[in-house]
Amino acid sequence: SKIKFDILSAQLQKLGHKVICVGSNHDNQTTCDLDLRGKTNISQLSYVIKNAKAFVGIDSFPMHVAQTFDVPGVCFFGSINPSTRIISEKMKYVTAVNLQCLGCHHRKPAPCTSTPTCETQFSDCINQVTVAQMMDKIQQVLMS
């Protein structure tokens, strides 16, 4: 959730990491050291990600760019099965555990789109992931 990313960003900054935010300009207001949301083209975005120490985010175009350049990172998944998106051994993922509905996006009839309809009505796949789980995985990536 947006609040979790804000807490995560603050924790990374406390540890001395520089947080650069990329993506669309309507994304959440996560605090960052350099805010490039809505300010880069594909070439500029690629340059920023290619030179990053690590990528942290969701299943998105920037995550795929990070994998293309073999940038280590952590990606957070909910309704999408990570095995359909992760191609780099350096990209780790975090998802809620023990939910029968994980990967529900792939069980929807065509045309399969990311819709706000959740089988549990509570988006457990996102809400059950804790900031501590996220931070633990990020620290593993940063230390490797």
Q: What residues fall within each predicted segment?
A:
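Nucleotide-sugar donor-binding patch of glycosyltransferase catalytic domains
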Residues: D35-L36, Q67-M143
